[in-house]
């Protein structure tokens, strides 16, 4: 049985931000959410987040995560002081306590499982995660014997010049037998350069403590500033992109592509440069995305093409072509075999199968039938200044260039709208609509106009 405690009370001053450090986003999730996610496969009996700086904001940001407990550290006096706040909440607990910093977003569940197994097999009072770094600057040092039993732990700022030569560092992940730690916590002293209560001071007081090295140093990258945040994002993206390329997805110029972990891709999808896939996006086999496109929270069926376009909260059926320079947003549904072309915006709109909107159009709050052709420059005037109104366009209807459809409006099946028309009334099936001024031609008007102006000037 294990209880998890996540340290999320610090401000993170080096981030230079009003936002608490643990709430900074990495690939669509906050740092602390990623840590919480990493402990889920361990099936902990309780998950406790220790909050402090802007605690209400931190708690609000995680309100949707079920069965999460919060304990407040009103004054931030170090990691040991943070764990002291758990004493009244774990009075009768006799199991293990796994402690992680809330700024370790790349830690893997497998690493934590291995650490817990080592802890149990060796009946340790405590087990800590360590690593060897070529440049350990900024990390606390761990000193062990040949059997990886910890002899001493020293924070970087408290290290002597000789101690700083040690490259074995504390990764900020601990597993304690809680009863042993609970006895030591009240007696911690702030005898250090920071005048803080260090959890590391408790390590050598609880009994046998073993160090376990992490295999991949990238997992223990702590996020203290924007540079480290960017580095973590690069590592995360490398993991994601390698996964999909090995699964049969082609990424052309992977360095210029970003893919959230929540995205699902099928084999034989091709992603061109400068394309960004975000949120709960699913792209099925044979689709070709990019270059220069953003797909967010959208589902694309087989053999869809998207070029230089933005697709958000939309569904696109098989064989449809989007772009270049199209914008789909607000729960758009595009049927099979459609074309949404140059400078077309769709908002909260449904297109039937084999419907085309190829050029320079805005279609909003509209249901469009099958085999409809939206002429260049067609606009749905759906907003009256107070409310947005719906438009319905029947099957096989064709709108001429530069048409304006003033909602609320219903066009039946097989309707033809003449170019330049402004349509304000419902149109029945099989109708032709001409809603524009009659053309008037005045021969020689320009010559007469010039002559009149010349005469006026000589008066």
Curated annotation (Swiss-Prot):
GO aspect biological process, one term: regulation of cell shape
Catalysed reactions listed for this entry: alpha-D-glucosamine 1-phosphate + acetyl-CoA = N-acetyl-alpha-D-glucosamine 1-phosphate + CoA + H(+); N-acetyl-alpha-D-glucosamine 1-phosphate + UTP + H(+) = UDP-N-acetyl-alpha-D-glucosamine + diphosphate
EC number: 2.7.7.23, 2.3.1.157
Region: Linker, residue numbers: 227-247
N-acetyltransferase, as annotated region: 248-459
Enzyme class: transferase
Cofactor binding note of this UniProt entry: Binds 1 Mg(2+) ion per subunit.
Function: Catalyzes the last two sequential reactions in the de novo biosynthetic pathway for UDP-N-acetylglucosamine (UDP-GlcNAc). The C-terminal domain catalyzes the transfer of acetyl group from acetyl coenzyme A to glucosamine-1-phosphate (GlcN-1-P) to produce N-acetylglucosamine-1-phosphate (GlcNAc-1-P), which is converted into UDP-GlcNAc by the transfer of uridine 5-monophosphate (from uridine 5-triphosphate), a reaction catalyzed by the N-terminal domain.
Subunit field text: Homotrimer.
Protein name: Bifunctional protein GlmU
Organism: Nostoc punctiforme (strain ATCC 29133 / PCC 73102)
Lineage: Bacteria, Bacillati, Cyanobacteriota, Cyanophyceae, Nostocales
């Amino acid at each position: 049985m294990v209880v998890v405690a996540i340290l999320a009370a610090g401000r993170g001053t080096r981030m230079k931000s009003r936002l608490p450090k643990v709430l900074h986003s990495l690939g669509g999730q906050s740092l602390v959410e990623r840590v919480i996610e990493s402990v889920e496969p361990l099936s902990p009996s309780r998950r406790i987040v220790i909050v402090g700086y802007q605690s209400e904001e931190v708690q609000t940001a995680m309100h949707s995560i079920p069965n999460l407990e919060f304990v407040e550290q009103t004054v931030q006096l170090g990691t040991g002081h943070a764990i002291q706040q758990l004493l009244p909440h774990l009075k009768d607990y006799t199991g293990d306590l796994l402690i992680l910093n809330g700024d370790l977003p790349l830690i893997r569940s497998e690493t934590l499982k291995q650490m817990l197994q080592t802890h149990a097999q060796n009946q340790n009072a405590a087990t800590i995660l360590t690593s060897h770094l070529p440049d350990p600057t900024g990390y606390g040092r761990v000193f062990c014997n040949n059997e990886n039993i910890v002899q001493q732990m020293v924070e970087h700022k408290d290290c002597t010049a000789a101690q700083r030569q040690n490259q074995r560092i504390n990764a900020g992940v601990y597993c304690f037998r809680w009863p042993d730690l609970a006895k030591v916590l009240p007696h911690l002293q702030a005898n250090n350069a920071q005048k803080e209560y260090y959890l590391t001071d408790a390590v050598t007081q609880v009994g046998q403590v073993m160090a376990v090295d992490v295999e991949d140093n990238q997992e223990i990258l702590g996020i203290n500033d924007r540079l480290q945040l960017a580095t973590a994002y690069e590592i995360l993206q490398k993991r994601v992109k390698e996964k999909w390329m090995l699964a049969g997805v082609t990424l052309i110029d992977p360095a210029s592509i970003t893919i959230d972990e929540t995205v699902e891709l099928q084999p034989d999808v091709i992603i061109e440069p400068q394309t960004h896939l975000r949120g709960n996006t699913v792209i099925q086999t044979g689709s070709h995305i990019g270059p220069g496109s953003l797909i967010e929270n959208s589902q694309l069926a087989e053999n869809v093409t998207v070029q230089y376009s933005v697709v958000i909260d939309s569904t696109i059926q098989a064989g449809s072509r989007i772009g270049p320079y199209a914008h789909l947003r607000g729960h758009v549904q595009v049927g099979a075999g459609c074309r949404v072309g140059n400078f077309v915006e769709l908002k909260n709109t449904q297109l039937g199968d084999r419907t085309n909107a190829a050029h320079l159009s805005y279609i909003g709050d509209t249901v469009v039938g099958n085999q409809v052709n939206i002429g260049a420059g067609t606009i749905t005037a759906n907003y009256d200044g107070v409310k947005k109104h719906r438009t319905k366009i029947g099957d096989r209807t064709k709108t001429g260039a530069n048409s304006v459809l003033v909602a609320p409006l219903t066009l039946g099946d097989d309707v033809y709208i003449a170019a330049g028309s402004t349509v304000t009334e419902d149109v029945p099936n099989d109708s032709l609509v001409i809603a524009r001024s009659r053309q008037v031609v005045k021969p020689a008007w320009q010559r007469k106009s010039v002559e009149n102006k010349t005469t006026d000037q000589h008066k």
